[in-house]
Every structure is written in structure tokens, then in C-alpha cells.
């Protein structure tokens, strides 16, 4: 969540194992996906991040970045919804 003013949240909740494997392009892409996810459900960026982290959406974005970044952000959000739902998420 670079540049979002959430540095305290980032320090508290970020799994730095993800950060060490992310390229300089993945970080802004992940940030954009988190923000778009929040907009889709009218929730804060913080809540979107916490939800995606809890239901493995962040891990999904990291693992499948090579395929996901070629699609639109909206398509990535659609994929996140499905992936999180398959991991116990409740937003749809």
C-alpha cells in the first residue's frame, strides 16, 4: 500500500515475505488492485487490504502476477472475488 498514507497499517499488517518476492512493478499493481477491490465494495482501502490478506487474495496477486497483470484491474478484482470466496470470503 505504497503512497496511500497507510504506513502504520502497512507496517502492522504487511507480510514482509511477500514484499521480498515482489518486483517494483508488482507493488503498484497490487496497490491498484486493493484500491479497486475497496471501491467495488464501497469499503476503505484498509478494510479491503485486511480482507484480501485474510482470504489469501494478496497471495493470489503475488503468485499469479504474471497472468493477472495482463488483464484489466476490473478482471483482476473479479478473480480476487472468486479466489477469496473459495478461501472462506463472503463478499460477492
Regions found by a protein language model. Give the residues of each.
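C-terminal alpha-helical interaction appendages
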Residues: 14-92
